[in-house]
């Protein structure tokens, strides 16, 4: 393991030190914590990783609805029983042995990958020769090819280096990352530059001054300067050649309850009360209508989503009744005569996070519950969540593929931390229903099981379902061929560098 880590770091140390002549694409990005595919835990990690590596499969840049595409490998041949997948190598600089080695790292006990859940259904994996990988599953898995398109399925060479479109040439932690294109491509960006800029006002000013080509999300504070009352882009920005791109995402955002916590874990009525106290109209207003209030874990547009109203949606009178039934009438703990105090841990103390956290506290205040806010750095926050050292925590899940399973896996007991089930929710009935869905032979049968899974999660409330994101991005006229996507990992390779006259 120690040698493997040394090789991984050494591979980046050998990246080309010289810059290439040509255009540079600059955007801000939240802190990247790792460039190791097996250890990646955030979309920010994924965006950097997919510039340097190629996943087993990719997602077609242009196709809508979203569709898989070849990447390191061609699309697989699948056996009639749906258990065996054969992948032919497509990247001449990689071998089948590289693929097997990279995927095996996900389930290595030495690495303890947070993405090991991806490989739990794999019975065997082997390189039949240099050009062919065979993966056999324990049972049918209709979404397995989508797992092979995730950044965690990125393929490393033996020395830890990648064969993606770019190579990392500079990484100033918490400040800047610079990537140079391995092979120059006429009309495309030769350099990609990620900047860590915490202050949203600074991000906005840098974009207006042309110091950034792309703004990945228009902040709440700047929304009125971007979009007029008619819902259209401000004419002054249009005159500068700026374009607004708005699409629904597959992001589900939530406040999680640590189910191992002695206060919130065993008290379902308390969790239901806090859900009912969450003021969705006020939350949507806070975000200037740039979000979709959530009614469960699955975003709109995903097949198998439960469409009935959430029984613990905002209802202050119901919340007051439930908090009393939970043993805290008016938020008071009868055993102490004092108010119930809960702690919400949030990663990164940005202005938006502070203000939105205070808003949540005001919601709980209306049923007598005091909410204290604790802020940590992103790395420390993830560690605290994975180790169960939080009570309530605010986080989200960015869908890896458009399937209900991708969101409902967040509640399966086999995926407890450090897997994606960060709340450590355990419900044997849910697990059984989930497993039946995976074994279903038809989409109709599978969706019935997904509906039952969602009904259980809605009743147990291991989350406060806060919202689903919309993507509202801006490009300057320096960027061409930009197609907004929920799978925007490594897509900078397709952008065209435009000269502004």
List the model feature ranges, each with a label.
Residues 27, 173, 293, 326-399, ...:
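Ligand/substrate-recognition segments at binding pockets and active sites
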Residues 75-111, 134, 203-209, 264-266:
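Aromatic- and charge-enriched surface segment that lines or borders ligand/interaction sites
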Residues 88, 114-157:
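Surface-exposed binding/hinge segments that line
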Residues 178-181, 265-362, 366, 426, ...:
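Append "and occasionally in soluble cytosolic enzymes with long acidic Gly/Pro-rich linkers
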Residues 181-229, 370-372:
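Ligand-site clamp/hinge motif
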Residues 239-241, 284, 370-381, 409-477, ...:
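Extracytoplasmic/peripheral linker and loop segments enriched in polar/acidic and small residues
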């Amino acid at each position: 393991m120690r040698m493997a880590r040394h090789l991984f770091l050494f591979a980046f140390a050998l990246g080309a030190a010289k810059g290439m002549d040509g255009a540079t694409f600059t955007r801000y990005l939240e802190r990247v914590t790792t460039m190791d595919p097996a250890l990646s835990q955030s979309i920010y990690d994924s965006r950097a990783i997919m510039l340097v590596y190629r996943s087993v499969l990719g997602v077609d840049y242009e196709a809508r609805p979203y569709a898989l595409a070849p990447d390191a490998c061609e699309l697989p041949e699948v056996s009639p029983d749906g258990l065996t997948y054969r992948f032919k190598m497509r990247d001449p600089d990689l071998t089948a042995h590289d693929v097997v080695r990279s995927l095996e790292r996900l389930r290595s006990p030495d690495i303890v990958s947070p993405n090991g859940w991806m490989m739990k259904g794999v019975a065997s994996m082997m390189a039949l020769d240099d050009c062919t990988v065979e993966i056999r599953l324990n049972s049918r898995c209709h979404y397995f090819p989508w797992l092979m398109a995730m950044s965690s399925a990125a393929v490393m060479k033996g020395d830890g280096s990648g064969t993606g479109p770019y190579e990392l040439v500079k990484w100033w932690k918490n400040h800047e990352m610079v990537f140079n294109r391995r092979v120059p491509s006429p009309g495309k960006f030769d350099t990609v530059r990620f900047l860590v800029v915490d202050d949203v006002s600074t991000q906005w000013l840098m974009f207006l001054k042309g110091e950034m080509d792309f703004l990945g999300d228009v902040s709440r504070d700047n929304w009125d300067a971007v979009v007029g009352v008619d819902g259209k882009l401000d004419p002054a920005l249009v005159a500068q050649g700026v374009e607004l791109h708005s699409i629904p995402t597959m992001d589900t955002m939530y406040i999680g309850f640590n189910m191992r916590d002695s206060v919130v874990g065993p008290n379902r009525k308390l969790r239901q009360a806090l859900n009912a106290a969450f003021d969705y109209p006020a939350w949507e207003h806070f975000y200037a209508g740039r979000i979709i209030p959530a009614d469960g874990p699955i975003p709109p547009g995903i097949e198998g989503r439960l469409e009935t109203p959430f029984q613990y949606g905002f209802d202050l009178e119901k919340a007051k009744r439930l908090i009393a039934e939970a043993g805290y009438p008016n938020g008071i703990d009868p055993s102490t005569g004092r108010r119930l105090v809960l702690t919400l841990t949030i990663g990164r103390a940005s202005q938006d996070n502070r203000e939105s956290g205070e808003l949540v506290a005001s919601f709980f205040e209306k049923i007598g519950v005091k909410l204290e806010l604790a802020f940590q750095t992103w790395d420390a926050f993830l560690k605290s969540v994975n180790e169960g050292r939080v009570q309530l925590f605010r986080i989200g899940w960015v869908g890896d593929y458009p399937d209900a399973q991708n969101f409902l896996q967040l509640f399966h007991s086999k995926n407890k931390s450090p897997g994606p089930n960060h709340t450590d929710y355990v419900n044997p009935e849910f697990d059984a229903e989930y497993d039946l869905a995976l074994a279903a032979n038809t989409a109709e049968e599978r969706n019935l099981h997904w509906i039952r899974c969602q009904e259980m999660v809605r009743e147990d409330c291991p989350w406060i379902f806060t919202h689903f994101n919309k993507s509202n991005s801006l490009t300057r006229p320096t960027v061409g061929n930009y197609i907004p996507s929920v799978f925007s990992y490594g897509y900078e390779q397709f952008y065209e560098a435009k000269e502004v006259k």
